[in-house]
Amino acid sequence: MRSAAADTVSGIIEKWSASFNKLDADARASLYSKHAFFFGSNPSLYRGNEGVAAYFNALPRWSSPAVQFNDVRTAPVGADLINFAGTASFFINEGEPPLSVKITWVIAREDGDWKIVSHHVSSKTPLI
């Protein structure tokens, strides 16, 4: 039986994936907290859902984007806080191998809705 935390994360992943596949940066940014910290695929720290929107709007307009989440792990930290870790594989151009990264989110209830408050991706290739 799936937990409530797993169901919450599954719903966010579904919305996140749909907005990535459509290149809808504003819909994706709406999943983030107004207080979010965001480390994506470049070294900059983006803050708040406006910063997250700026990051997503600056990404290339890929020809056939798709994302797949695997190895999903969730852990409720409290009634209003969930940890998530997994692997995200980005298929950005048809025929090219995916870009796969480790991804973590901290998800919190904000104004009655679940929002991503911390987003971090890192290379699957060991750095050390």
Per-range role (PLM):
Residues 1-27, 37-128:
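A beta-strand edge to alpha-helix "cap/lid" segment located at domain peripheries
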